[in-house]
A protein has these predicted regions:
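N-terminal secretory targeting modules
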Residues: 1-171, 177, 183, 190-194, ...
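Conserved SGNH/GDSL esterase-like catalytic core that processes O-acyl groups on lipids
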Residues: 28, 58, 157, 165-270, ...
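Short, well-ordered coil/turn elements that cap or connect secondary structure elements
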Residues: 163, 194, 280, 319-320
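A cross-domain feature marking catalytic cores of carbohydrate-active enzymes
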Residues: 246, 289-290
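Catalytic His-Asp segment of secreted/periplasmic serine-dependent ester chemistry enzymes
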Residues: 252, 290-374
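Surface-exposed amphipathic alpha-helices with a cationic face
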Residues: 271-282
Length: 374
């Protein structure tokens, strides 16, 4: 018997974006357990916090019944500054494929946050024990920019099981965090292998591999991938595979000023180091090429940036480093204008895949090559 994760998100500082911080609201979302087990526990993160934060209530709803989650026996508890901690183990028989609803009330502001669940909604006040929920609130800017409700502080959900999963981590940016290719791929793995393999999402919106974006807004994009790699990827027990899907944001910050940090040479060196570390640990590495970015309205995109993206993709395709490669660029690009995403496959901003684009990416994976079962 051992603990195995069924849900995970990587954390970034929320102080630049108040709507991420969660104070005095309840966040509700659902997860599917890929394994059967006897107990459940939840891990909380306060990596970026300068002071403790308080969870004012946490419940798990399974088959219409409420189960209260505690820490040190208390329904109200704090998460220490600069640390992670677990809840008490909740005795709760969980069946493979079962849907669990998580309700979390924040009594204070939380610094660690992310938004990876399209089904997440929020309510003002504490609604963790309500038998019926009121209509959820949804900010207009979320729909406008394709954002999800944030789930502050919650880091991982684990089930105590006799059949621990082998873990594959999707290490990426918003294209990963939005879950439009990760969840369909996770479902394909589940349908093919049951709980033998689980795909965890370690994407952070705006994240770069090589570059820490400056300013308060930049901080909310998380530490650069080379810095967060150990915390967000290597610490997984049972890690067997990593999908590398970072770099398209680095390209957008390329200039004469950043050229010493963001270049094909720096990208290749950083990726080679990551792959070497993973291979030494017996972990398979899967590369994704960088998708088209031209037309993305939030940043000017220069010919030099596009040339760098193209050269990085050529390097990925030609490299013998990887155990497997999926060509996201070739899948998503407009055949008549290959620096742009095909109009059928983006959410309206010319960068982020819509449901059809995400499904196309997920279906492109050969599961035997992904898992190493081939």
């Amino acid at each position: 018997m051992d603990w195995t994760p069924i849900w995970h998100q990587a954390a970034a500082p929320a102080f630049a974006l108040g709507f991420l911080a969660g104070k005095k609201k309840t966040v509700v979302y659902s997860v599917i357990s890929q394994v059967s087990g006897e107990k459940l526990r939840i891990r909380f993160s306060n990596h970026y916090g300068k002071k403790p934060y308080t969870i004012g209530g946490l419940t798990v709803w399974a088959q219409g019944e409420m189960h209260t989650v505690t820490r040190d026996g208390s329904c109200v508890f704090t998460v220490p500054a600069g640390e992670s901690c677990y809840s008490d183990a909740l005795t709760l028989p969980v069946t493979m494929g079962e849907e669990l609803e998580i309700r979390l009330y924040y009594a204070s502001k939380v610094m660690d946050s992310n938004m990876i669940e399209e089904n997440a909604v929020s309510y003002q006040g504490n609604h963790t024990t309500d038998s019926e929920l009121p209509p959820p609130r949804r900010e207009k800017y979320m729909e406008q920019y394709g954002l999800y409700e944030a789930i502050p502080g919650m880091d991982q959900i684990e089930v105590f099981t006799g059949q621990p999963s082998k873990i594959i981590v999707a290490f990426g940016d918003s294209i990963t965090a939005l879950n439009r290719w990760v969840k369909p791929l996770q479902r394909r793995l589940f349908d093919a292998y049951g709980g033998d393999y689980t795909l965890m999402n370690a994407g952070i919106s705006g994240n770069c591999l090589l570059y820490d974006v400056p300013g308060l807004m930049g901080a909310s994009y998380g530490e650069k991938g080379v810095s967060r790699f150990e915390r967000d990827v290597l610490r997984f027990s049972g890690l067997c595979g990593v999908i590398l899907a970072l770099g398209v944001n680095d390209v957008a910050y390329y200039s004469q000023k950043t050229g010493a940090v963001i270049s094909l040479e720096q990208y290749g060196s950083a990726v080679t180091d990551i792959v070497d570390r993973l291979h030494k640990a017996g972990v398979r590495v899967i590369a994704q090429t960088l998708p088209p970015r031209s037309g993305f309205v939030k940043k000017g995109y220069t010919p030099e940036m596009e040339a760098l993206r193209v050269s990085i993709n050529e390097w990925i395709r030609d490299s013998a480093l990887f155990d497997y490669m999926v060509d996201a660029d070739a899948l998503l690009r407009d055949p008549k204008n290959p620096s742009f995403t095909d109009e059928r496959y983006h959410q309206g901003d010319h960068l982020h895949p819509n449901q059809a684009g995400g499904m196309l990416m997920a279906q492109a994976y050969d599961l035997q090559k992904l898992t190493g079962e081939a």
